[in-house]
């Protein structure tokens, strides 16, 4: 019961704790050096995906979905940003990390040839499968999921299962270690919402994926 109570408190933070995002550059590499503050992680997820939801056509959703570029209105000004999952950056040792722009562009070009298939998609799972089939080298599982989410939002689809990858898998492992997820479930590619304990049931599958990664450092403390 104590673990469930702690988890419930962390879930509440997903909707109530302010989220601050620093962007040294905009989506086009121009110096920006600005902090953005959102009401919560849940609010940021909705605000960022709202850009893709309102794009004029599927091709623009594919191109922007792969490039991770999005526009957001903040303090009465519009900014074009790039999602940090696909940003290129130098780590503490000076090594270049992230996804190169040439990889993102190649993925967008390749996926554009599958526009007809995407138009015929009937679910997030369909979109995810199509995006994955167009994978280019350097465009990893997290980028595949992110692109599928962005394109699916435009098409009106949402995942019904929780996809595990990178930090999301780490968050799931912490819940598993506390007996809040079935044994070895963190090794699966996807989990059903019903696999998760009651405190997380107020999250949909997309939010829960986001929560597991964003709050993994809190989950380890349960």
Regions found by a protein language model. Name each.
Residues 1-50, 117-128, 145-222:
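C-terminal accessory module of base-excision DNA glycosylases/AP lyases that mediates lesion recognition
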Residues 65, 69-73, 131, 151-152, ...:
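Generic structural signal for hydrophobic core residues of well-folded globular domains
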């Amino acid at each position: 019961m104590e673990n469930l109570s702690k988890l419930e408190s962390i879930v509440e933070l997903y909707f109530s704790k302010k989220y601050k995002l620093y962007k040294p550059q905009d989506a086009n590499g121009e110096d920006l050096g600005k902090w953005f503050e959102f009401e919560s992680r849940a609010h940021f997820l909705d605000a960022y995906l709202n850009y893709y939801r309102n794009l004029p056509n599927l091709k623009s959703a594919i191109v922007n979905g792969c490039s991770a570029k999005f526009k957001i209105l903040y303090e009465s000004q519009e900014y074009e940003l790039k999602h940090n999952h696909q940003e290129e950056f130098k780590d503490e040792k000076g090594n270049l990390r992230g996804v190169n722009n040439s990889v993102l562009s190649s993925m967008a070009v390749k996926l554009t040839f599958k526009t007809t298939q995407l138009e015929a998609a009937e679910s997030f799972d369909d979109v995810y499968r199509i995006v994955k089939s167009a994978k280019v080298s350097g465009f990893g599982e997290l980028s595949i999921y992110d692109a599928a989410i962005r394109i699916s939002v435009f098409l009106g689809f949402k995942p019904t299962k929780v996809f595990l990858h990178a930090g999301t898998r780490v968050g799931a492992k912490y819940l598993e270690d506390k007996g809040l997820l079935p044994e070895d479930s963190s090794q699966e590619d996807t989990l059903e919402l019903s696999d998760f304990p009651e405190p997380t049931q107020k999250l949909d599958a997309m939010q829960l994926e986001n929560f597991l990664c964003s709050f993994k450092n809190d989950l380890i403390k349960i």
